[in-house]
Amino acid sequence: MLIADQDVQRALARVSQITSSLCELPAVPTLDWLDRAASCIARAADSGVVVIALASADEQGVLSTRDAVGVAASRDRSPAEEAALTSLRSRAHRLQGAALPFRVPSSRDVLLGRMDKLQANWKEGPMGRLWNGHVRGDLICAVAPMSYGPNQAILVCLDATASGVDPAALMAAVMPLLVRFTSECLGPTFDNPRNWLTPREQEVLDQVALGRSVRQIAETLGRSPHTVHDHVKALHRKLGANTRGELIARALGHLARGVSAEHEGLAPREIAEGGLPAPRGGARTLV
């Protein structure tokens, strides 16, 4: 049966776009991972701004944010609007440790709704300090527990304007996938974002995944072999990889952190020849 309702068609198309972009997130933790994730969720509105933050939950489920945030807009912004985004990012970082007006669901459910419905006086608390002067439309927030470890949670806020499709419904549809990818990728280093890959390490990892040697990578990137070697050592340490094969497998999302190729029953030769298990996070991309 054909779907005649244009609103439904638009909603399905938007969910498909967001899902596709989420599947393109790196399979390894990078310093810009949350920014990229925020950019994916921003597609839920024709014009909107997204803030994503990792958070810890106490025994009562009360949230406090950590110094790991991502900020993005759904479209290109003017210089003044870019400055506003920078200000919002700065505020989000300063929010670290503040108790938020949410309680994390005890199961893998998602708490989602418009901010004025979740808490009537939200403007008087930390969320008000974060969004003061930045809200132009409906502020929609979602909170969900991460599956990797206890007391880990993710907070997503979308200031949505000029949207032809209900952005809250779109967020509800894609939040489970975002939570899954965030848990798999950032969960193991939740307490230590310093182990997330820098832009230079991402460049080197891309080259390693192409099968290039240290010398070839140095020539391609215009750096010394010694510098590239240091980056490769850092990649092995940060991603917990013992071999180059494991490093590539982690980069492609075929091997979870803390699991060795031997544990998966794969020999280095099998990795080199493509005998890898299916990616845990779907079709993932290089960083």
Give the residues covered by each predicted segment.
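Short alpha-helical "packing" element that flanks the helix-turn-helix/winged-helix DNA-binding module
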Residues: E201-V208, L247
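Regulatory input/activation interfaces that engage signals or partners
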Residues: L2-A13, Q17-P29, D35-G149, I154-S163
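Basic, Lys/Arg-enriched C-terminal extension of HTH/homeodomain DNA-binding domains
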Residues: H236-V287
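Regulatory hinge/linker segments at domain boundaries
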Residues: S183-E203
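Recognition helix of helix-turn-helix DNA-binding domains
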Residues: P193, G211-E246
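Amphipathic alpha-helical "output/dimerization" segments
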Residues: A162-F181
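Short, locally clustered residues in the helix-turn-helix/winged-helix DNA-binding domain
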Residues: A209-L210, L252
